[in-house]
């Protein structure tokens, strides 16, 4: 975020966006499964793995990527060990960025420099794609490469 605030209305959120980058939150589905069994929804955060990068692109650099539908249209692919397992687009995100910022700031102070994750781009989750269709869960030694059009490539090795 470029600026901070509380209870930011969706109509003014564009002034708060410093830029866009790729984020892999390395969801811990085992922890999430335990929470879902309690009917609480996935609420438990983790502080051991999130990857960002390789750089941040400012909003003016993406002006032509916005569609008439008000959504950002950027292709996203995911490869594991050079095998394509996912091909999606940011226009498949359920909530628009403006609503995400509005919700995140509801009764909460957001600060300049905070990062907000948009959630998974359609087809971007091994759980939803089914592990049997993606060569299984990621494991030690695997190389995961996320590429988002105009945002670059984020590649990480599982250690």
Segments predicted by a language model, with ranges:
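Thr-Gly-centered strand-to-loop micro-motif
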Residues: 87-88, 111, 118
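Glycine-enriched loop-and-adjacent helix/strand subsegments that border the catalytic/binding cleft
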Residues: 1-101, 107
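Acidic/histidine-enriched ion/cofactor-binding microenvironments in catalytic or ligand-binding pockets
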Residues: 10-11, 67-68, 102-115, 130-147
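Structured core elements
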Residues: 21, 75-79, 109, 117, ...
């Amino acid at each position: 975020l470029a600026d901070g605030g509380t209870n930011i209305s969706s109509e003014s959120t564009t002034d708060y966006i410093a830029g866009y980058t790729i984020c892999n939150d390395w969801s811990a589905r085992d922890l999430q499964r335990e929470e879902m069994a309690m009917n609480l929804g996935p609420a438990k955060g983790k502080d051991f793995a999130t990857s960002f990068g390789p750089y941040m692109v400012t909003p003016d650099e993406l002006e032509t990527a916005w569609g008439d539908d008000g959504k950002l249209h950027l292709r996203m692919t995911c490869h594991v060990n050079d095998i394509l397992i996912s091909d999606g687009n940011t226009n498949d995100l359920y909530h628009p960025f403006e609503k995400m910022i509005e919700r995140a700031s509801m009764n909460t102070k957001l600060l300049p420099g905070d990062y907000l994750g948009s959630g998974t781009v359609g087809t971007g989750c091994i759980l939803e794609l089914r592990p049997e269709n993606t060569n299984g869960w990621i494991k030690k030694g695997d190389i995961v490469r996320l590429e988002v059009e105009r945002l670059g490539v984020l590649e990480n090795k599982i250690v």
